[in-house]
From Swiss-Prot:
Residue positions of the active site: E174, H248, C365 (nucleophile)
Keyword Isomerase among record annotations: no
Gene3D superfamilies listed in its UniProt record: Succinylarginine dihydrolase
Gene responsible for this protein: astB
Native organism: Escherichia coli (strain SMS-3-5 / SECEC)
Protein name: N-succinylarginine dihydrolase
Binding site for substrate: 19-28, 110, 137-138, 212, 250, 359
Classification lineage: Bacteria, Pseudomonadati, Pseudomonadota, Gammaproteobacteria, Enterobacterales
Pfam families linked to this entry: AstB (PF04996)
Pathway this chain belongs to: Amino-acid degradation; L-arginine degradation via AST pathway; L-glutamate and succinate from L-arginine: step 2/5
Amino acid sequence: MNAWEVNFDGLVGLTHHYAGLSFGNEASTRHRFQISNPRLAAKQGLLKMKNLADAGFPQAVIPPHERPFIPVLRQLGFSGSDEQVLEKVARQAPHWLSSVSSASPMWVANAATIAPSADTLDGKVHLTIANLNNKFHRSLEAPVTESLLKAIFDDEEKFSVHSALPQVALLGDEGAANHNRLGGHYGEPGMQLFVYGREEGNDTRPSRYPARQTREASEAVARLNQVNPQQVIFAQQNPDVIDQGVFHNDVIAVSNRQVLFCHQQAFARQVQLLANLRARVNGFMAIEVPATQVSVSDAVSTYLFNSQLLSRDDGSMMLVLPQECREHAGVWGYLNELLVADNPISELKVFDLRESMANGGGPACLRLRVVLTEEERRAVNPAVMMNDTLFNALNDWVDRYYRDRLTAADLADPQLLREGREALDVLSQLLNLGSVYPFQREGGGNG
């Protein structure tokens, strides 16, 4: 059956700031306390979406979350009106304010793990929300992510959206950032590659930085998504590269159809894994980047592998890269060698995503890949699909509500909270989502 990959990109939120919240993500730590520009960040993301849509790649948008997220501050014992809660937190425990104001939901590669209908036992598209258990600021995302995805994929005959796994370390799940799908045409059954960093009883794990994904979580997600057991491979990421800042697999590997583009040190037991994939995926091609040409450190600093590998109708592929790749002589030299080598990659497309990159999120972090048949695509909420009208409306919306300068101190400003809620109210109407945010359902949550 004919099917296409639709990229659903996260729209950067109004509180995008640099707080260094993500231990193990070296860009996040390095840019802590810098001044951010939320308006520019949102526009950089929108430009990528629009450019790819104009190039013929189906593209949609996932809206930001409500931030600062007052309900969690109340759970932590802060009381009074919303404004009083903000004031108390800023005075007594400012570190919490940064966590509940993080714009990290923009990295929707961590929103969920997707199983296309060609891979599932019941013939539906399945989406399992990620619990993002390893980081407090990200663990807050799952309930609203679930509401948003249910509003976008609202046809229950075609889509099954599953709640996140229990919030315990044993079941730490980071979503599609640790998941690859390999195969022929998108509408054909594919091989799902789940990548984990640790498992119970196995001492092979990183020592410097945390392994966020467990094998136990990956196995549970595969079950929830009803993936045909014959179409699943579980593989461990190389613990040594996690300790070098590869906190998700999409920082060291990216797949598309029959191609796996990865660093030669990406996986534990990589030789065996690639042999297994060759045996089980027709036409499988591994493009392994040697450490002698691109070190793991350079791969992390440029986000070479946090790229999007997209298929054209003629079978060729385009690699979507952050500007940092072009600015690194060694990485750019390798990429130009790749273009003339015998592989499907025939074009490099570079985007300036500096605002997101400084927090450790490149092109692949910003998108959730969903393979859909034509019938399934028609069942998606049409208001989120990118086109000229939506692009212009979202740009105007960003101009109206987003600040062009934000520091950690600004997060305590009650006006920022009010601006954010008004903006999301307007956006949820623009995208025909209904009342997906807690403040919409609770009348603002003042108490």
